[in-house]
Amino acid sequence: MTSYNRSVAWLTVCVLLALHIGGSHQQQQQCTTPTRLRGRCISIYECDSILDYFKQRILTWEEREFLRKSQCTGATSGRQPFVCCPGNGSKPVVAPATTVPAGTASTTPAGPAATAPSGDAALADQLVGGLLPNPKKNECGVSIGMRIYGGQNADIDEFPWLALLQYENRKGERKYSCGGSLINRRYVLTAAHCVIGEVERKEGKLVSVRLGEYNTKTEIDCVTEEQEEICADPPIDAGIESVIVHPGYQDMAHADDIALLRLAQSIEYTSFVQPVCLPLTDFRASKTGEVNFVTGFGRTLQESRSAVKQKLGIKVYDHARCQEKYATKNSSITTNQLCAGGEYAKDSCHGDSGGPLMKLQKVWYLEGIVSYGNRCGLEDWPGVYTHVPAYMAWVRSNIKE
């Protein structure tokens, strides 16, 4: 077994599964597998049929979901996860749609031609004929783990839709500045101020997008878990075929701060590069006080810019109060914007511009795009985000095969 496969297997075992730490000794309890076979609840290290299956490849969304559903609550020893192991020892068939328990999302192979369930015309329209991944089929928003000013390091394959925008100045020097979110194989959603206006004068021309990055200081990103080295695939650098800026955006203003980047190539999904879900018909917008997450490579308490992907949970801020706060700065907050944060030293800023504000609703949805704020991490001064649900019609009308 190669070092990489060992890494994938360990990552699968230690991160995808919730680990049950306890002292009971209910060894080999009977259980039912996700495909409704009788099995025994045992350590995954004793279940060759599951362990061998998941050591062989980079996991698809369906395989990730199957492994999660195979988890059971048996006895534990240290940090060993327990799974429902088929009684006949055969390799599992991964969760066909007809065997998924009622009330859970079905899982079918992901791909650009995926369509909505029959009879759901509204969702079919929202998916633009399959150009957007379907949240109901776990085709997006699947993150193994759970810039961030006051944040912490993300897991190596957490938030795999995060994109880094690269710019080139007149001297030919390149640097990363803004962020973005991969929404399908050809498009990244970001902030308009990251692609036109002052950013061009300050950073240079936008030339490429990097996907699957974890540590900008290393060529191959690796972390150590339980004395086992886990390494990511090399990041993907994609050229930009075209830039689509919302027609309402004006340089140095903040309204309609949203843009689409059409990549010059179709992106192949891996465990480290996947799309985030867009808010569709059944998405419930966040209320004041709810916790959403931001991720990126921006400023931290220790550094002007983080080399390692960061994450931070922040609360949605009362909209009316946010309008009042920013009115004192001669800045108008519209209903197409969302405010979040406002705790000291916990904010998204600088290098996080254009990056995602995410809401977990079974899968991860892109609810906001980092737009602007009043400095970084100030007490009772929330950041302002472009509210993505308000722009879904624009997004749908501007993507193509």
Curated annotation (Swiss-Prot):
Disulfide bonds join 31-84, 41-72, 47-85, 178-194, 322-339, 349-376. Inhibited by serpin SRPN2. The keyword Signal applies. Its main location: secreted. One of its GO terms (molecular function) is serine-type endopeptidase activity. Residues 30-85 form the Clip domain. The active site is at 193 (charge relay system), 257 (charge relay system), 353 (charge relay system). It is found in: Secreted. Its EC number is 3.4.21.-. Residues 1-26 form the signal peptide. Glycans are attached at residues 88, 330. It comes from the Eukaryota. Proteolytic cleavage is necessary for activation. Residues 148-400 form the Peptidase S1 domain. The record marks 147-148 as: Cleavage. Forms a covalent heterodimer with SRPN2; the interaction inhibits CLIPB9 protease activity. The clip domain consists of 35-55 residues which are 'knitted' together usually by 3 conserved disulfide bonds forming a clip-like compact structure. Serine protease that functions in the melanization-mediated immune response. Cleaves and activates prophenoloxidase (PPO), which is required for the activation of the prophenoloxidase cascade probably following the recognition of pathogen-derived products. This is CLIP domain-containing serine protease B9. It comes from Anopheles gambiae. The gene is CLIPB9.
